[in-house]
Structure formats: structure tokens, C-alpha cells
Amino acid sequence: MLFRGQIRKMITQLAEPVQYYLNISGDIIHLNELFGKKISIQHIGYQCIECGSSEPVFRMGFCKKCFFESPFASDSILKPELSTAHLGVEERNLEIEKNIQLQPHIVYLAYTGDVKVGVTRESQIPTRWIDQGATFALPIARTENRYEAGVIEVALKQHISDKTNWRKMLQNEYEEEIDLLDFRNKIESLFPVESRKFAINEEKIWKIDFPYTAPEKILAFTLDKHPNFSGILQGIKGQYLCFQNGDVINIRNHEGYVVDIEI
């Protein structure tokens, strides 16, 4: 069966294990049903996720023009502490920025090979954690807007990483030794004084079961360097497809790529 279209990040459904669906221009492919089967991917072009142009993807699925103009690629998307919608100050499009920023946000701890701190809209739980490949996650603060969550994250990331090391995430090491409750208790004092009112004492640690077993070796590839790829799908974690022999590809990093996929 052949599918042609634009890659978007995989759709996920929390289950045991997580269910994954590949979205190719609206064609939805249930990937869990394809484990042990051959998938061929051929890169044939680009389609910006914002304007639809065939210009090469610059970053995050956007062409260069849209990356520097779209409110969905503004600085506050990557750095919540730069949010200004709560002040009525526009970055690129105030109405869109209000919709994104002026809603409850969660500051969380997650285990993705190391313990990390992060920020997400409350409505994006647990999708955000699944996309990051977090096997454990714990909300530690709930704020009224994105800026407030960013202030907490800035304070905490002086002591804890806010990045995911994709290789460690895919190696599955030390997962059973992580106690996020204990970790939270140790860092509560690092909250800015004015932000401590947002702290929450969740007792439930989220555990996410991925359809994935770490291979002996991991070799990441991109469609830029390998525009024609075929392999046997073995597992999925985060936004990574893992094939036989340890070849892995980050689907989210290929948003906006146009491909032929044969199953």
C-alpha cells in the first residue's frame, strides 16, 4: 500500500502500550499494527506546515519565511518566559498568542533518560510527555498563564536540564531507579518566592508504557542524508520510529517533508 503526502508529528493515544498513528496529509496509519513489517520511505519534496509552499523546511516544519513570521514559531513557543500576551503586548499576532499563552500551564518533572524540567499547556497532558519519550512524569506547578510557568522553569533549569537527550531516552537505562516525588521534594525550595503559590503536591507519578525495546546500538538518520530508506519497524518511543538494526528517525523533526511511504 502506497501513501503520498506531508509528514506531521505522530498522533498518540495513551494506552498500555501507547498507540501511535502516522499522519500523512490526513491519511492515518496505525503503526502498532506494523511492527515486524517492512516500511519504505522516499523523500520527494517539502510543504510548509503554515503556508503550504514547496520551499525547503527551515525549522519545526516551517519554511524560512514562516519560521520568522508565524506566531506558532515565535520565541515564546520555545522560551515560555518570553511570553507577553498577559501584558497585552504582541510578538507576531496578539490574538493567537492570547489563545496559546493565556490558559493554564503545567510545570513538570519528567524522566527521559535523565530527569528534566519542562512546561506545557495543561490541555497537552499527557501528549507532551509521550512526544518527549518520558517514561515517568510528575506535575509540580500549575500556573494561570505561560509566562508564569516560564519563570519557574528558568529558576529550575539552573539546577536541572530542560532538554531531552534523545540518545539516553532511547537507551532505557536506570528507569526503575527514578523517584520523581523525592526529586520534587528536594527542589521545591528552588521556586522563586513569588511563584511558590503555584506549587502543587501531586502524589500520582504518570507511568508511560511505550511499544519499544532498546536495541543494542542506535543509529539516527534523516531524510536529508538518506532520502530513500527501507526497514523493518521494531518499536516506537517519543516521536522516534525504531527499525531493525537500531536505525531510528525522529518523525517530528521531519514535519513538512513530503514523502512516499510504502507498507
Predicted regions: what is each one?
Residues 1-263:
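Non-catalytic accessory segments flanking enzymatic or RNA/DNA-binding domains
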